[in-house]
């Protein structure tokens, strides 16, 4: 089945439209008809009525006007695109791409990178320009200084150039650096000297500690009960030796005479003993050097007060009581053996040997125990 609109196709159009409509109305009685019947109707038409297609008819004009009205905007876009493409072909772009989307994106990226590179280059140029400006300003200041100096020296009959001024400045800087180096070397040498002094002080303090330990050990060997009688006996023997021989008072002579009278003979000196005897005083008994020294406490301010009186090596001044006659029986008779040491040893000392000799108070020295 074919619709009636087929009649309006260009194949059935002719110049005499009225005749064609009459013939169609005679043969076509309904809206639809079979195709074969239409073919018969078309074949019955005369040949002069089918001279070819005619584009000047009213239907085509209607179609063209509708198309122009509806697609006016599309036609304007097409014309603009054609104009742009024509202009691009005439004036080639600087990027050199073919107009595709990927190429355009790449070109935009490259343009951005190029702009960033241009920014970096501009920043570098600005920094270089600032550096050059600072250098030029420094040179101008130096030139001003040199001109002022030259004017001042020209009045006084002198003349200086910029090179001489710079040379003097460099010499001053070198002298300042040399002084700083010498000061640093002096500080380092002073630190080394202070370290050496500190080591020497430590060695001296250790020697003092050893000496105090030896003195403490020698004092501790004598019992408290025998300290005061021993001191009195030593002084009496010294007084007797002085009256008999006429020699001045020396503690080591007193110790020798006391040992001879008590019948105590010292052992023969050995090599180690002789070496130690040279370092220590002559009054130290030999039995005190053979035994090791015990550990002592730290040195204190009371060590000088505990030193026995027989350690004094300088002679006492002469007095008027030197010509007194000492009874010999007090010097020759030994003291009785004492009891074990106790707190009341000083009170139990026999007074007959202490009070029998009229010693002068300046000559009488009692140890502090």
From Swiss-Prot:
Pfam families: NPIP. It comes from the Eukaryota. Residues 325-346 are annotated as: Disordered. PANTHER family: NUCLEAR PORE COMPLEX INTERACTING PROTEIN, NUCLEAR PORE COMPLEX-INTERACTING PROTEIN FAMILY MEMBER A2-RELATED. Belongs to the NPIP family. This is Nuclear pore complex-interacting protein family member A2. The gene is NPIPA2.
């Amino acid at each position: 089945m074919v619709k009636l609109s087929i009649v309006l196709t260009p194949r059935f159009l002719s110049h005499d439209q009225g005749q064609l409509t009459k013939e169609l109305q005679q043969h076509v009685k309904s809206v639809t008809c079979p195709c074969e019947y239409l073919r018969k109707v078309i074949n019955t038409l005369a040949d002069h009525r089918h001279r070819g297609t005619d584009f000047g008819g009213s239907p085509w004009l209607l179609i063209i006007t509708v198309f122009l009205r509806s697609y006016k905007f599309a036609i304007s876009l097409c014309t603009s695109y054609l104009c742009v493409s024509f202009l691009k072909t005439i004036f080639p772009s600087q990027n050199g791409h073919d107009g595709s989307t990927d190429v355009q994106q790449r070109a935009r990226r490259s343009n951005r990178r190029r702009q960033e590179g241009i920014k970096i280059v501009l920043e570098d140029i600005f920094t270089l320009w600032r550096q050059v400006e600072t250098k030029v300003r420094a040179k101008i200041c130096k030139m001003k200084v040199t001109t002022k100096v030259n004017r001042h020296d020209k009045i006084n009959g002198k003349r200086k150039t910029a090179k001489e001024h710079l040379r003097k400045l460099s010499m001053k800087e070198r002298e300042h650096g040399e002084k700083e180096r010498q000061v640093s070397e002096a500080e380092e040498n002073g630190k080394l000297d202070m370290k050496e002094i500190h080591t020497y002080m430590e060695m001296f303090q250790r020697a003092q500690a050893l000496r105090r330990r030896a003195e403490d050990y020698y004092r501790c060997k004598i019992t408290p009960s025998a300290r005061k009688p021993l001191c009195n006996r030593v002084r009496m023997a010294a007084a007797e030796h002085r009256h008999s021989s006429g020699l001045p008072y020396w503690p080591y002579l007193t110790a020798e005479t006391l040992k001879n009278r008590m019948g105590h003979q010292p052992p023969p000196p050995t090599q180690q003993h002789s070496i130690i005897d040279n370092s220590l005083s002559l009054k130290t008994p030999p039995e005190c050097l053979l035994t090791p020294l015990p550990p002592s406490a730290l040195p204190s301010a009371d060590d000088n007060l505990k030193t026995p009186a027989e350690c004094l090596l300088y002679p006492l001044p002469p007095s008027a009581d030197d010509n007194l006659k000492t009874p010999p029986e007090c010097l020759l008779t030994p003291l009785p053996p004492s009891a074990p040491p106790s707190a009341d040893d000083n009170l139990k000392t026999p007074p007959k040997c202490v009070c029998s000799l009229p010693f002068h108070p300046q000559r009488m020295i009692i140890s502090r125990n």
